[in-house]
Structure formats: C-alpha cells, structure tokens
C-alpha cells in the first residue's frame, strides 16, 4: 500500500480507496495531456462504477484505471476480467440511458489506463458491447 508523509514527518498508510483515487487523478491528467476532455469521474450506476468518462472528439470514452506495483501475475491491464468488463458495460449502458443515449446512438469505446510500477499503458478500445 502507498504511503504519504504527514505533518509530523512519519508516513501514513493510504487506504485502497485513496490510492485508487490518486491513480485516477494521474490517469485523468495523463489523458488530458493526450487531448481528451474530462466529462465525469467515479460514476456509479446500480452497483457498478466507471472510473473516468472522457471525450475524444465525438467519441465518449469510458476509462478503467488500474494500478499494480509490478507486472507479476500479469500486471495492471490483465486485471480487467470478463466479469469486470460486463459490469463496466452495464454501468455505461445505464449512464448513456440517463443522458438520452445508447450504444446504438453514441460513438463510444472502453479504454484501460494501466499503471504498472512506473510504466503507463493506454489500451484503447479494449473491449466493446459486442465482445
């Protein structure tokens, strides 16, 4: 788990949520540096969550952010399982419906931004609603 120095100088453990939030901020900044525009973060719909929603031109990009300290056991990108993909699809479907859209009417894709150690990997169009 990551640590952060406190005012007293002794490190304090970050919670898993705090660590995840920090990597999501890093991913957002990194993607903005690549020209994407921020739409929303931590979108919750009926038990599912999308880390980031961005726009690239006319495309809505649903982003899953992953972090692993090392590539042992496949690294960050390998941790997006079929089950997780299904949950992301369901959450995106509900979000689109709330915004008067659907997979049939909105150009969208699912990306993964994976941080493994000090490396960042952007996997565009990782999966789709036809996977």
Curated annotation (Swiss-Prot):
Disordered: annotated span: 1-20
Cross-referenced InterPro entries: Restrct_endonuc-II-like, tRNA_endonuc-like_dom_sf, UPF0102_YraN-like
Compositional bias segments (type: Polar residues): 1-19
One Pfam family matching this protein: UPF0102
MF-aspect GO terms: nucleic acid binding
SUPFAM superfamilies: Restriction endonuclease-like
NCBIfam families: PRK12497.1-3, YraN family protein
Similarity comment: Belongs to the UPF0102 family.
PANTHER family: UPF0102 PROTEIN YRAN
Listed name of the protein: UPF0102 protein YraN
Organism: Escherichia coli O157:H7
């Amino acid at each position: 788990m990551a640590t952060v120095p406190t005012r007293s100088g002794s490190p304090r453990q970050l919670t898993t949520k705090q660590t995840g939030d920090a990597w999501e901020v890093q991913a957002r900044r990194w993607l903005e540096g690549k020209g994407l525009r921020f739409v929303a973060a931590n979108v919750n719909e009926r038990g599912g969550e999308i880390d980031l929603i961005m726009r690239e031109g006319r495309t809505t990009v649903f982003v899953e952010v992953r972090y692993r300290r090392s590539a042992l056991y496949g690294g960050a990108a390998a941790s997006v399982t079929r089950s997780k993909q299904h949950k992301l699809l369901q959450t995106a479907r509900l979000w689109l419906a709330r915004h008067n859209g659907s997979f049939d009417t909105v150009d969208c894709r699912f990306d993964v931004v994976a941080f493994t150690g000090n490396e960042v990997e952007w996997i565009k169009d990782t999966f789709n609603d036809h996977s």
